[in-house]
Amino acid sequence: MWTVAKIRADYEGWWLFSDWTDQIVEQYHFETYEAMMNFYNSLILKSKDYYDNYLVGKYNIHAFYNNCELGFCEDCDEDLQIFYSYIVLNNNEVYYNLPNIE
């Protein structure tokens, strides 16, 4: 089974933190790779229009953000940029072979 999970976090390098699954705000499930990729491609293209900015990081994973969408970090006593990423999972394991979507 394929899953596309949207995470919301105040950091972009989600793969550096073991608790990234705690940041999931939406999930979409698919039976086939083709169905998942059709949805994922559409989601990335729509997100490029919706968000002010994006970065393409490790494993071709996009991190989207809007200017001035900040969250206060109590531990560091400052406002941090909020990022949104879509993580693809295959049978609950992160799938790292994503194509670059232009």
What do the predicted segments below correspond to?
Residues 3-5, 27-29, 84-88:
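Ordered hydrophobic segments in well-structured contexts
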Residues 43-102:
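Short, mixed-charge low-complexity intrinsically disordered segments
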Residues 21-38:
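A short, exposed loop/beta-hairpin motif centered on an aromatic-Gly-Thr core
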